[in-house]
Amino acid sequence: LCLMAARQKSKGSNLLRRLEEIYEEFGYTESITTAIVYKKEKDRERMSAIMTSLFEGQLRKAPEWKPLIKKEFCFRQQNMYMADLQGGNRLIIRPSGTELKLKIYIFAGGSTRDEAIDTASELCGLARRTLEEKNE
């Protein structure tokens, strides 16, 4: 960190300005982690059924997700579903290893921080609604 600061100072800049330049060039990224929590041990089967439906491509068939998903990755051995979404965004769903919950990870980008946050929030809400519907 000290070397980076010294280098930027020698160029008449500083770390904050350099970080702003990087954001201008590459955009902002926001990540959100959330989970659907289950209460009973028997819900483990429900979680398993949801993961199986993801592995079988059911999310891609849902009208609200169809235009968003570019490519799906199913890591059955790790029990993890991942989808690359339009705009360079990403969705990951996997069960917790220690608790009765499905974890949802969203990674979203934007040309501004607010845009990245808004996109991540929208995708997170959509993922939660979709999984909660499958939960009923």
Residues of each region from the PLM?
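Phosphate-binding and adjacent anionic-ligand microenvironments
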Residues: 2-97, 101-105, 112-120, 124-136
